[in-house]
């Protein structure tokens, strides 16, 4: 009887230890997930910045990577990628380097087409059109004979100018992951077509699917903040071997480099 009681007590003790350990792990995971979501929320707080000139006076996260005299450079990038079934993949997007030291902005409108040859090898053809930004206007810096393309470049709007994540804290059922070895972290949320940002993308781009996208937020670097690393977001409408439709965007604050172009 005594042996039986000791055995029962031992089993209960082991179960209690497992239960406590599980609670500790769950608490740590929930705390880290909340930290990841808050980290992304800070990044998304710059959306929307309708006037790109406002970035000249907008301060970002600074660490030891920055020279004390360097005010930093904002790098903004937006790209739409469409690969219909049986057709080539094409991406059209723009990147700008907004230098807060010189208060000048330059970048490129980039068109990339990926084809597949008879042997199944992928071939990438990229064309860059240099631009500058003045008074919130995109201006090509070299002649563009194609009027339609010129108009597309001049009328280009970055997602940061119209995207809005004021309700991000209310996003539910996210799939949040963390890899401490890189370190990297991500969050995924299934959206619907009534979502404001989805409606804005459909308004500006011909998106050949009615399927609602998944929002993917990806980051790397120290969760507490670092200028080394990156954060970007992606609206994935379709992703498979035959068809790909997605929109990607990033806004980063980095130490300035004079040779950016």
UniProtKB/Swiss-Prot annotation:
GO terms for cellular component: plasma membrane. A lipid is attached at residue 23 (S-diacylglycerol cysteine). A lipid is attached at residue 23 (N-palmitoyl cysteine). Its main location: membrane. Residues 1-22 form the signal peptide. The keyword Lipoprotein applies. InterPro entries: Csa (IPR007595), Csa_sf (IPR038641). It is a lipid-anchor. Keywords: Cell membrane, Lipoprotein, Membrane, Palmitate, Signal. It comes from the Bacteria. It is found in: Cell membrane. Belongs to the staphylococcal tandem lipoprotein family. NCBIfam families: SA_tandem_lipo. This is Uncharacterized lipoprotein SAUSA300_2428/SAUSA300_2429. It comes from Staphylococcus aureus (strain USA300). The lineage of its organism: Bacteria, Bacillati, Bacillota, Bacilli, Bacillales.
